[in-house]
Regions:
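Active-site groove signature of glycoside hydrolases
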Residues: 111-130
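N-terminal binding-site loop/beta-alpha segment at the start of enzyme catalytic domains
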Residues: 1-76
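Beta/alpha (TIM)-barrel catalytic core signal, keyed to glycine-rich beta->alpha loops juxtaposed to Asp/Glu
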Residues: 127-323
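Short, acidic/polar
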Residues: 29-42, 98-115, 160-169
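Alpha-helix-loop-beta-strand connector modules within alpha/beta enzyme cores
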Residues: 62-81, 138-148
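Active-site mouth loops of central-metabolism enzymes
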Residues: 21-33, 90-104, 129-131
Length: 323
């Protein structure tokens, strides 16, 4: 497993990370009872970067990591996130809460669940522009660095794609890393962020499972994360990707492998696919042994200009509902 630097922090992360949300959340169909087994297997297979948040499974994700990793704390890199208040829900859903009192409380609880006295990367979770530009919040995050509670601080953009301005502002403020969506259909704003020398964690490399043939046929579900996409968008993404799938098959590759390898070609620190079980973990790790040739890369780039760019634009526009 190759390691990459997380920007200028000196932290090295495995190029393939394990996202805990897909193990403990109904949104990705994970099995909580088997989550610890997947984490342990991931470590055995060389993954040392684990991406979680306090809200994943309402604390369960962090507990799973602590239970599974045990004494390996100094051998792994843990990213967790705060800012989505699941302790005080509205209409059954967490709310954004960036008051300093809440952040102190949330971070303390995260450390308790993780059974550690520090996190490697601490990120604000889906903040709005006002939170990102807040000097009070920024200073608070950097105080955590000075106190040794966080080795680095950043911003996780979401839940959707179109947070370019917020990402750029976070970089300008001095946050050391971003987490964002990127795949060969939804290439912006990720390729803009790629130009900056910061830590970059990529999620959803399979475009809400449209680029993972093992998850087809895809259906809309209010429980699943792909509810952020219309079923019509996903169907078009699957249809437009067929020439890539067919070419890949002739070369002994799966579409999900192509999607992962294409993303790994870029200057990102770590790519975190949606891993719901041991089978997903094994096939994603095994994909790292494959290679893309120029014919596949060229076809992807051609189809982006002729087909995917319109889907990318629609994804950017859907974010307006969350701003």
């Amino acid at each position: 497993m190759r390691l990459r630097y997380f920007g200028t922090t000196g932290i090295k992360v495995s190029e393939l990370g394990l996202g805990i949300w897909s193990l403990v959340s109904e949104e990705w169909g994970g099995d909580v009872d088997k989550a610890e087994e997947v984490v342990r297997k991931a470590y055995e297979m060389g993954i040392t970067f684990f991406d979680t948040a306090d809200v994943y499974g309402e604390g369960k994700g962090e507990e799973v990591l602590a239970n599974a990793l045990g004494t390996k704390r100094d051998k792994v890199v843990i990213l967790t996130k705060v800012g989505l208040d699941f302790y005080n829900k509205k209409h059954g859903r967490p709310t954004l809460n960036y008051s300093l009192d809440y952040l102190r409380f949330a971070i303390k609880r995260s450390l308790e669940r993780l059974r550690t006295d520090y996190v490697d990367i601490l990120m604000l979770h889906n903040p709005k522009m006002a939170h990102i530009t807040s000097k009070e919040i920024f200073d608070f995050m950097h105080e955590l660095k000075k106190d040794g509670i966080a080795r680095s601080v950043g911003v996780a953009l979401g839940p959707t794609l179109g947070w370019l301005d917020e990402g750029i502002k976070a970089i300008e403020m001095g946050y050391e890393g971003l987490e964002f969506i990127y795949n060969f259909i939804e290439r912006e704003p990720g390729e803009t962020f790629e130009k900056y020398n910061i830590g970059k964690v990529v999620r959803v490399p399979h475009a809400s499972d449209a680029l993972d043939e093992e998850k087809n046929p895809l259906e809309f579900s209010p429980k699943l994360h792909r509810r952020f996409k219309s079923l019509e968008w996903i169907r078009r993404a699957v249809e437009y990707s067929k020439p890539i799938k067919e070419l890949a098959e002739r070369k002994g590759l799966k579409l999900y492998e192509v999607a992962l390898l294409y993303t790994l070609r870029h200057d990102f620190s770590s790519v975190v696919p949606n891993t719901a079980n041991l089978h997903d973990l094994e096939r994603f790790v095994n994909a790292l042994n494959k290679e893309l040739d120029e014919e596949i890369i060229s076809l992807i780039d051609q189809l982006y200009e002729s087909k995917f760019k319109e889907l990318n634009q629609e994804s950017l526009e859907e974010t307006n509902a969350y701003k």
